[in-house]
From Swiss-Prot:
Coiled-coil features, chain-numbered ranges: none
Xref: PROSITE patterns: LYSM
Notes on the domains: The LysM (lysin motif) domains are small globular domains involved in binding chitin in eukaryotes. LysM14 contains one LysM domain.
Keyword Ligase applies: no
Organism: Penicillium expansum
Region (Disordered): 1291-1317
Biased composition (Low complexity): 1291-1303
Keyword entries, A-Z: Chitin-binding, Repeat, Virulence
Annotated protein name in UniProt: Non-secreted LysM effector LysM15
A GO MF label: chitin binding
Described purpose of this protein according to its UniProt entry: Non-secreted LysM effector that might be involved in manipulation of host defenses for successful infection.
Disruption phenotype: Leads to enhanced fungal virulence, with faster decaying on infected fruits. Activates expression of several core effector genes, such as PEX2_055830, PEX2_036960 and PEX2_108150, and a chitin-binding protein, PEX2_064520.
Family indicated by similarity: Belongs to the secreted LysM effector family.
Domain annotation LysM: ranges: 1179-1225, 1231-1277, 1328-1375
Length: 1410
């Protein structure tokens, strides 16, 4: 149709006067963090109905299964058609007023319980068509939507019930009148093909069984392996060429779904035709459909919620005529045939608000279900036609008041295209979350009319509407991939309606991204264009033939001009922060934008859109086998351990490339359930996988409940409609570990699957076990360690995922609050690409989301909520941090600030390319960023938060500086791609990597503890040898090493390893050996004199120089530093504490009047009997009183430190050797040097003509920068070697043939010694050779030649693990290969004889030997 006439005030919605609302936030992940306002932490009374909870506010009423929307106090039934028509005429006249009033005065979310009547029942609204409703019709009819109301108007009530007489009259009129669907004149499939690419419905993995194995059925796959089977189910091709509905696999199966706790005979699967629906477009099917929905005593009026009455209600193809609302009960899926969408046709006699409704008003403020608790609903694969309903009655296709775990998918809404129509597709006045995707709207006054706390919508198409979509309030909303064609107004953003039920909340935060608006008068209309009002972001969107791109309707001014065709990369209005402390109001300006990684995107309307993928419908499965797990032996009865049979079924199905159908049930698994790569799984009404049993009970030994693939798997995973849960106590349960990486974009994916910990029948975590009145932690209610772990080698596409630790009981009438303890929510370590669309994580102790060492991550609308019981106990209690990557320890929380000890909403640690679109928070701190880059946050909104964002080592972004009504909001928090946010003092290092621990047989909890980062200077990584501390003679440098945060990190590391790695070993050592040694060296190095506050090593270095401890002045011997350091060494298994130290400590105790242990301690490794050590030099010496290493070094031409290292169990200090002990003298060196004050390596190498790093090579105890050369003299002595130990590079002896070299490598190739045989396999790219003798040992050869043992063996592969016994006397071995000796491609052989070799530097011939 052509565009509507020029816009006037009448067809541009005006705005209601409202108080500034709570604004929501957007990131490249929309994050709504919602807090529980409890107790002394948040300054409100700690009672259930007193805080502002997003879900749990209930009526104290008795359960009921009321099946009908009609009033029990009905009027008499009409006896004639004419009488029925008159009743409907009057009813619809009232309907036009009442439905309009409902839109004008919508009910906002209510966070307190509503009052009851005197008899304890919920109040009942008056009946439609009564005199009460006719009062003031004339006045009410004059109200324009979104305009300010008078006090008299604001007091009107707009709820009603439908009497049975009215409903019956509507049925009679409907069946008496032709009701065929109208002619809409729109080719929806063509429009979708024009703008959106056709995508795979599913990806088929290769069938592993090439032939029957005798156990499983073999199905030959006609479709190519790893190929698409079908076009996207949302492409509406089914509307053009309909396949036979009999081909829908689900309808051909025996229905075995059951609910273990429901009454016997209860049906999960319901086909509406089996309940009397005809689907012929003539018979009124309203009653039959409602009977199909309500059958079995389900949770309806005055029930609140229930988990034991799930239902999947199936609609075969057809046209279902309805004359009053179809009521969707709690925990219900409405499923249309995906091959041929059924049509729900609203009759011309229709009475009600929504053709399908998710909630029923019983009064202006009371309904069947609390909207913020209205969980677990799905409607998909339908056409909804309201064109026949009265044009002025404001009838909608779906009245959708929902919360988490809900979705609308694959639907087409048809409305009148008359300019005067009031019809609408979706009406949503309130709620708390959900997901909507692949909806098409044709015609209507509003395609969609939205209001909700936080929501995600994707892939919406609007055609020929007056107003494509309007948002009248929210906290946070992400709209992605929206197409608007031929509408007067595209997106309308209004200020919320007024009235007695208004909270004053306006549109807080809204993102419109990857959108296309074509042929519209106004692309976007808003009156909230003002400082401290709505945060709005328009990103990567295109306008074509749009008169005005953005219109300020309050002022009647153009904010952003239209045009024939142009794109908007990033534009909006709101506060923008480019540093932690300052934000600036951007009043309709370009907003900084990220560079989207290719891996996260696909084709777009201008620049690439973020990738999306809809859940598979499996509409054309070909010869693929469908496996029903109950048919194959699984019970799903909530009692039987189904783990073994499910593991077998899933393994076989993956091998067959079959699709696994899990009928509804509760499937107990008592150990890990393995979902192999290649699995495609579909549940029914959220089939439950329930972890239970002793293997999940130990929080110190986490156990994965459902493992999706093995680490390193690449391929296909498709999971949908499952619920992962537990039966407590299960403190160690990791509900899902995701390991699979995609093989094609988005091939590893999960949709509409949720996590629930407690609060339901069968969980053993309900009111009777875990009532919130329990002030102490009930260990039986500690129920999970981690909900979802996306591991480092994986990628994931997740859509509509709700991870909920229950805060209330879903299966009791009053839905009492409970205390359930889950450690962590969602941990993302993936290196990408990973997408999180419409996800939520709530009520976990340490964090709701943590992004750790991750990259290439998109998070679109994440919502969180903290546990109600916090800050009692203080986080991380009752859990111990350190089991998983970068667990928060809350060590920086001041004990006087209780608010600090609350869970983090989101932490981004050591990550890059993280894009977040929107958030809303509530507590002292909620969002931490540490050592991360390319992180972009949009539309951040907080409530009750002191610090909006808390980057490490930076000033926080304060909510008080970004006030927006009663919220605080930031449109964009951005730094640029190369900026490091939250830069730590030290990035940190790992003592162990995961690869280095492979094959050690460590437990799943031990490895993460060992691989945690230590947040210290990298210098400390070398402190793994037992010592007495590190002295650097540089206080500034030591201050840096002794950072307090480093000590906390080391202490936490050692503590965690001790806890999680108890009774395990790494080789022959205890797991804490390296970490404990570093920590002990840190404590020694950083110990300060209690009086002078100088470092103790600085103090000791100024002590009087003496020959031995017994010669020390008493004040020095008995000083705090000297005695304490020696006591610390004695007390620690990680220290160097020798017999000499023992004698000194005994001397201290006898001289200084101290007491305490002095005995030697066991080393931190297993001591096994070994032969007496070999003295390489064959020279021993018996020590005499007064001997020092320096004295003996000069006598034997060795380095003083070499004496200590050759005798580590005897000598602990070169200045004080124990007498009468036989010690081994090391190999000598030709050139010695006695250190002088201020000497350094660089100077000595220059003065003595030595090559770079030579001194460290000859004296390997020196650290990487020779920084300990001076500081270690007291312990290691002062005599250095300036030539190799055991040999020199001269040309006068036999044994080593050489050319000059640098370190252990030679500079040029030489031929092997004449008349020698080169050992088998030894490289000829060698510049130093050694001819072995019968008495040689490998260690002697290495020491003489200056080559490391590793390089020696690599260059001479004939030397086995037992190197000494592999040596062959007379053979020549390479002891100095040239650089790149093993790079075959580098060398070009030009040999002219067996002795000629090539070299990159120079060819040389031996001129002698040493």
């Amino acid at each position: 149709m052509p565009p509507h006439p020029n816009t006037t005030k009448e067809n541009i919605p005006s705005l209601v006067k409202a108080t500034p609302g709570a604004q929501s936030l957007r990131w490249m992940l929309l994050f709504a963090f919602l807090c529980s306002l409890v107790g002394n932490a948040y300054g409100t009374h700690h009672q259930h109905h007193g805080h502002q909870h997003l879900h749990h506010q209930v009526r104290d009423v008795k359960a009921s299964a009321t099946p009908t929307v009609t009033s029990s106090s009905s009027s008499s039934l009409p006896s004639t058609l004419e009488e029925a028509k008159e009743i409907i005429k009057n009813a619809q006249a009232s309907l036009a007023v009442m439905n309009k009033g409902r839109l004008a005065y919508p009910q906002w979310n209510q966070y307190i319980a509503q009052p009851k009547s005197k008899n304890g029942t919920s109040p009942v609204a008056p009946a439609l068509g009564t005199e009460h409703l006719a009062t003031n019709h004339a006045m009410i009819a004059k109200i324009a939507l979104n305009e300010s109301k008078t006090e008299d108007q604001s007091s009107q009530k707009f709820s009603y019930t439908i009497p049975s007489g009215v409903a019956h009259a509507a049925k009679l009129v409907a069946e008496a009148s032709p009701q065929s669907p109208g002619s809409h004149g729109v080719d929806i499939a063509a429009i979708r093909r024009k703008y959106r690419p056709q995508r795979n419905d599913t990806n088929r993995p290769a069938q592993k069984y090439a032939q029957s194995n005798g156990l499983d059925g073999y199905v030959h796959a006609q479709a190519p392996m790893n190929s698409a089977l079908d076009s996207d189910s949302g492409d509406d091709e089914s509307q053009l060429t309909k396949r036979s509905s009999a081909d829908f696999w689900l309808t051909t199966m025996t229905q075995r779904g059951s609910s273990p706790y429901a009454p016997e005979g209860y049906k999960v699967w319901r086909n509406v035709k089996e309940y009397g629906a005809k689907g012929d477009g003539v018979t009124d099917d309203t009653a039959a459909i409602n009977l199909a929905v309500s059958d079995g005593g389900r949770c309806g009026a005055d029930c609140g919620s229930s988990t034991i009455y799930p239902a999947q209600v199936y609609f075969p193809p057809g046209t279902y005529l309805v004359s009053s609302p179809i009521i969707q009960y709690f925990n219900t899926e409405f499923l249309g045939n995906p091959l041929d969408y059924p049509t729900i046709l609203a009759a011309s006699s229709f009475v009600g608000l929504g053709v399908i409704t998710s909630d029923v008003y019983t009064g202006d403020t009371t309904e069947w279900y609390i909207n913020t608790n209205n969980f677990l609903r799905s409607v998909r694969n339908f056409n909804v036609d309201v064109t026949r309903t009265p044009q002025d009655a404001y009838v909608c296709g779906i009245h959708w008041q929902v919360a988490q775990g809900t979705s609308l998918e694959n639907m087409v809404f048809y409305m009148s295209q008359d300019a005067a129509t009031t019809q609408q597709g979706v009406y949503m006045e309130n709620g708390s979350g959900g997901f909507i995707t692949n909806l098409t709207f044709v015609g209507g006054n509003f395609g969609a009319y939205f209001g909700n706390q936080q929501f995600t919508t994707s892939e919406l198409t609007f055609i020929n509407a007056k107003n494509a979509l309007q948002v009248h309030w929210d906290w946070a909303w992400t709209m992605q991939d929206v197409i608007i064609e031929n509408c007067v107004n595209g997106l309308v953003i209004v200020g919320g309606a007024g009235g007695s039920m208004s909270t004053g909340q306006s549109v807080g935060s809204l993102i419109l991204m990857d959108a296309l608006i074509v042929n519209a008068t106004n692309g976007i209309v808003t009156s909230l264009f003002a400082e401290n009002s709505t945060s709005f972001l328009l990103q990567n969107s295109v306008f074509r033939d749009v008169t005005t791109a953005v219109l300020d309707s309050a002022q009647g001014t153009e904010i952003l001009a239209g045009g024939a065709a142009f794109g908007v990369e990033s534009w909006g209005f709101g506060r923008v922060a480019t540093s932690s402390t300052n934000s600036t109001f951007y009043n309709g300006q370009d907003i900084p934008v990220m560079e989207r990684p290719v891996s996260l995107t696909y084709m777009g309307y201008d620049k690439p859109n973020f990738f999306q993928r809809r859940r598979p419908a499996y509409t054309n499965i070909g010869n693929t086998q469908i496996i029903d797990v109950k048919e194959w032996g699984a019970a799903g009865d909530g009692t039987t351990n189904d783990g073994p049979i499910l593991n077998s079924i899933l393994d076989r199905a993956a091998n067959l490339s079959a699709i696994v159908f899990i009928p509804h049930g509760i499937y107990i698994v008592e150990d890990t359930l393995h979902i192999p790569v290649g699995s495609r799984i579909i549940g029914q009404a959220w089939s439950q996988i329930m972890m239970k049993g002793s293997k999940f009970e130990n929080q110190l030994k986490p156990r994965v409940g459902v493992q999706v693939g093995q680490v390193g798997d690449v391929g296909i995973i498709e999971i949908q409609s499952l619920l992962f849960t537990v039966s407590g106590p299960t403190a160690g349960a990791v509900l899902v570990e995701w390991n699979v990486h995609q093989s094609t974009q988005g091939s590893a994916a999960m949709w509409d699957s949720h996590f629930r910990v407690g609060g339901a029948k069968g969980s053993s975590l309900q009111t009777s076990q875990c009532d919130k009145s329990d002030t102490a932690v009930n260990t039986a209610c500690v129920a999970a360690s981690l909900l979802l772990h996306i591991t480092s080698q994986s990628s994931a596409y997740l859509e509509n995922i709700w991870a909920w630790t229950a805060d209330h009981d879903l299966d009791t009438t009053a839905q009492e609050q409970i205390n359930i303890y889950s450690g962590r929510g969602i941990l993302v370590e993936s290196q990408g690409p990973t997408w999180l669309y419409g996800t939520s994580s709530e009520h976990n102790v340490l964090y709701q989301y943590q992004v750790s060492n991750a990259k290439d991550l998109y998070m679109g609308m994440i919502q969180t909520e903290s546990p109600y019981f916090q800050p009692t106990p203080h986080a991380p209690q009752p859990f111990k941090a350190g089991l998983f990557s970068n667990d928060p320890v809350f060590a920086d929380c001041d004990s006087s600030s209780a608010n600090c000890f609350a869970s983090w909403a989101l932490r981004i640690i050591d990550s890059s390319s993280v894009y977040i679109m929107g958030t809303e928070d509530c507590q002292q701190r909620a969002f931490e960023i540490s050592q991360s880059t390319d992180t972009w946050i949009y539309n951040l909104v907080t409530k009750g938060i002191v610090e909006m964002i808390s980057p490490v080592n930076e000033d926080p972004t304060l909510a008080a500086n970004n006030v927006n009504g009663f919220m605080s909001s930031i449109l964009a928090w951005v730094r640029g791609s190369n900026s490091t946010i939250g830069e730590r003092t030290f990035p940190g290092f790992q003592i162990y990597t995961a690869d280095s621990l492979e094959g050690q047989g460590l437990t799943e909890s031990c490895t993460p503890a060992l691989t945690q980062k230590v947040l210290c200077s990298p210098f400390l990584k070398t402190w793994t040898s037992p010592g007495i501390g590190q002295y650097y003679k540089n206080t500034t440098f030591t201050d840096m090493l002794c950072d307090a945060g480093c000590g906390e990190s080391l202490g936490s590391y050692v503590d965690n390893v001790e806890t999680y790695c108890a009774n395990q070993t790494i080789g022959s050592s205890i797991p804490t050996r390296n970490g404990g040694t570093i920590y002990h060296n840190y404590n020694l190095t950083c110990l300060e004199d209690k009086d002078t506050k100088e470092y103790c090593l600085d103090t000791i270095m100024d002590f009087t120089t003496v020959e031995s401890a017994k010669d020390m002045p008493t004040n020095e011997l008995c000083s705090y530093c000297y005695t304490t350091m020696l006591e610390m060494r004695q007390a620690s298994i990680y220290s160097s504490y020798t017999e000499s130290d023992k004698e000194t400590l005994e001397l201290i105790q006898s001289t200084c009047g101290l007491t305490g242990p002095t005995e030697l301690h066991d080393p931190p490794y297993t001591v096994t009997p070994t032969p007496d050590p070999v003295c390489v030099s064959n020279t021993t010496y018996t020590t005499q009183p007064g001997d020092t290493c320096d004295k003996l070094a000069k006598q034997y031409s060795v380095a003083s430190a070499a004496i200590l290292y050759a005798n580590p169990t005897i000598i602990g200090n070169c200045s004080d050797l124990p007498a009468s002990r036989d010690i081994c003298m090391p190999l000598g060196c030709d050139t010695q040097y006695t250190l002088q004050d201020d000497d350094n390596c660089w100077q000595l190498q220059r003065d003595y003509g030595l090559g770079p790093d030579s001194i460290r090579q000859y004296n390997p105890w020196l650290d990487s920068d020779c920084l300990n050369m001076q500081g270690a003299r007291e312990i290691l002595g002062s005599v250095l070697c300036l030539s190799p130990q055991g040999a020199t590079h001269n040309t006068t002896g036999d044994g080593i043939t050489t050319t000059p070299g640098n370190g252990e490598y030679a500079q040029g190739v030489v031929s092997p010694p004449e008349n020698s045989t080169v050992a088998p396999g030894t490289t000829t790219k060698c510049g130093r050779w050694y001819s072995a003798t019968a008495d040689d040992l490998c260690v002697q050869i290495c020491l003489k030649s200056g080559v490391s043992a590793k390089l020696f063996k690599a260059a001479n592969p004939s030397l086995a693990a037992d190197c000494d016994n592999s040596l062959i006397a007379g053979d020549a071995y390479c002891v100095g290969p040239v650089p790149r000796w093993n790079d075959t491609a580098y060398w070009i052989e030009t040999a002219t004889s067996s002795k000629a070799v090539s070299t990159p530097l120079a060819s040389a011939k031996a001129t002698g030997s040493v």
